[in-house]
Amino acid sequence: SHYPYPFIDGKFDSTLFPLAEWREASRLSLSVADVVDWSTGSGDADDPMLLDQIRTKILTRRGIQARRDQILVTMGTQNSLYLISQLLAHRETVVAMEEPGNFVARELCEKNGARVVPSPVDEQGLVIDGALAEVDVAYVTPSHQIPTAVAMPLERRQALMESAHVHDFMIIEDDYECETSYMDHPLPALRSMDKEGRVVYVASLSQVLAPGIRLGFIVANADFIESARQLRRQVLNHPPLNNQRAAAIFLSLGHYDALMPRLGRIFRERRMRLRGALSNIRGIPLEISPEVGGTTYWVRAPRDFDIAKLAIEAERHGIL
């Protein structure tokens, strides 16, 4: 059935896709010189043009400096987390996972035999407490916590980095929806604060452009990236180079830079409308997450509230 208002996790609004700009980038990627570049094969190497565009157009906005050999292109965040979990999570590993948090990341670690320790989340993200002294890896979503949508402030980020130093654990930083922040000056990525090579950074172009683009990337120390590349090679040498080149051209033409503020305006407007609609629901004291950006809206109702009844009533009005 068709629902006018499909609130489904991960569902993409195709009207937001930059069709003309992507078509231009795809057309330019089919020039003779570009086709020669991406069609002749490159072993397991990623497109150097895309690596440079990621370095200069995306990572610099997050305060991250990286060389080509510190970046690996993937098929998206889930693929990135799979590779990372294979390298960092095993039977002797204790992994701190945000609770509530990303169930996909949790399942990947658990399937490798790691012991996952649920770590509480408050209005500032992952709580930094003594329990972290016992872990080997911590998975966090500091820019836009999944699913509560809170952002980790600078002081909490610094405390997490200090805890990682003192207790000697690695950090998987999933920079989920970092580009759709409403903040005038987005907070620096944990990776940008890392002086010891403890942070493995994950981001995605698919979340911004469209899930079908299937491009993400990992940033870490060169030896970790080489291990991830060897693991990736067991499945595929690299994500399709024609897609990588089209994405590189899209970035180089400034289309990505222009898209970010446009998406931010649209998401902010939709968020305001949703907040207004929720505030009109009488008799239900709702707690709504702070407005830090992104596409998710975290709402908490009283424990005795019948959410199933609300879902049925919402469906009658075309809301799924």
Feature map (PLM): residue ranges:
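N-terminal "arm"/small-domain region of PLP-dependent enzymes with the aminotransferase-like
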Residues: 1-45, 316-319
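Short glycine-rich anion-binding loops that position phosphate/pyrophosphate groups of nucleotides
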Residues: 12-13, 142-146, 207
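Conserved core of the PLP fold type I
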Residues: 26, 30-168, 172, 179-180, ...
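Conserved glycine-rich beta-strand-loop-beta hairpin in the small C-terminal domain of fold type I
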Residues: 101, 265-275, 286-300, 307-313
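Short, contiguous acidic/charged loop-to-helix segments that flank catalytic cores in large enzymes
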Residues: 121, 147-151, 233-238, 264-265, ...
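PLP-dependent aminotransferase class I/II
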Residues: 199-280, 288-289
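Conserved PLP-binding active-site segment of the aspartate aminotransferase-like
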Residues: 220, 298-305, 320
